[in-house]
Amino acid sequence: FCVENGIGWNDTFEDDTVHDDYRIDYMRANIQSMKDAVDIDGIPLMGYLYWGCVDMVSNGEGEMAKRYGQIYVDADNYGQGTMERKCKDSYYWYQKCIQSNGEDLK
């Protein structure tokens, strides 16, 4: 298994979502590398667990500014906000990737 794989970023909420192409690019590159490891090198990869489906407090920095999830949470570094959740672009990209069993990385 490839586990706890993700990227933290200071996401910006705009147009009622987060346009996180940098997260999509990161995930695409990692998934392609896993596919290559299986197809070219014969590695018996059983699964991939992306780390941080929902934004959470950063373990290293103790703040919300650096976000890891594919779902935005309206909260600041002090726990203030509506706690409303909104799917980021990466959520929809990963949904499509999963539905295709990793074949659609566009």
Map each language-model feature to its residues.
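Non-catalytic scaffold segments within catalytic domains of secreted glycoside hydrolases
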Residues: 1-106
